[in-house]
């Protein structure tokens, strides 16, 4: 763990000591080196699945893909932020990069933690840099409102979790993940036990977010700068799914009946958020609601508590992390040129930026889960599992996939086709930096098609 964690922490020092002219190239290169080193975690050499295990940190097949995604995202965020941060004073640029690096440090410690309390502390710590990024570097004054929503939803959701964890510590005597999975599971009999069960999962359902407690997400996404949107969509939402999988081990056996209403709500949320997407005019808002729908499917997969459900959820989390991050980058390239997030004002882009249209098409097709993408693999596993749980869910998941395809193609056609608007007189061409950014999103997606077992989670050890 330290071979990645120490260089990441040292990047903060590098940020403040680098010459101004070399700040962005140096940070991009160094963070890319750290991301490359993190790939060594993919090599399994233990029967138990746990690797580099010590008293507080370790990696296993579930956390490794998420850890690598976290490390991979830092150079991409730095690349994407260069254009709008370049005019800021030097110290602000350095503060911004330092916040991104500190966020990555907290995320590595959250995904790598073996103690659930350490995971909880890091889960809450990620809130601070994200909140500063949204409220300080957001575009409109509405960002303060978005920051308040984000703060209160997260804190109010996770306070019951802290109480539940302290109760568990008293009952079991330990909160170590490798130990808990081999211990006697707690029986849930009384109404108090059921409340304890809900408290354990509420924080993660808010973070995912489940439909019904999702209002903070579109606000935070729309108002955040590009780096904030990328890290929110790609990694922070996945903390919810990861936490649910970790804690659900100690919540069996009665969890199956308690999970029913949540599965129904998650599946209903897919249709509802899809319908909301069909009416959106704001590009970033559309992608944000799309994330809510996809994470609803992940929640349903986890709550079925079967190997297929867990595998499908892990695969979809990684695939969605790369896809939604890429879509936010594309939305940002449009925003930097037209200074508007309204889709209809940025139409006809295919004429001016034809190569960008290729990226738009590719990412939209990945978003609607076109074969042979990893998105499809994750969705099919979860849909098969929920169908096995109840045949009626097929109508909801099938309709959800259909609506996803409709709004993805609608987004593509609205932004890329049609007549150009008169107010767009001169638009700068696409930069090599932007194509590099999109290539670095697409490359893992394409490579994972060839070896998807790397992101199968617990099914692959």
Swiss-Prot record:
UniProt-listed GO biological process terms: ATP synthesis coupled electron transport; electron transport coupled proton transport
GO cellular component: mitochondrial membrane
Coiled coil residues, start to end: none
Keywords of the record: Electron transport, Membrane, Mitochondrion, NAD, Respiratory chain, Translocase, Transmembrane, Transmembrane helix, Transport, Ubiquinone
Catalytic activity annotation: a ubiquinone + NADH + 5 H(+)(in) = a ubiquinol + NAD(+) + 4 H(+)(out)
EC number(s) given by UniProt: 7.1.1.2
TM region positions: 20-42, 61-81, 93-113, 114-134, 147-167, 197-217, 225-245, 258-278, 285-304, 309-331, 351-371, 393-413, 436-456
MF-aspect GO terms: NADH dehydrogenase (ubiquinone) activity; ubiquinone binding
Domain of life: Eukaryota
Membrane protein topology class: Multi-pass membrane protein
Subcellular compartments: Mitochondrion membrane
NCBIfam families hit by this protein: NDH_I_M
Protein name: NADH-ubiquinone oxidoreductase chain 4
Organism for this UniProt entry: Latimeria chalumnae
Protein encoded by which gene: MT-ND4
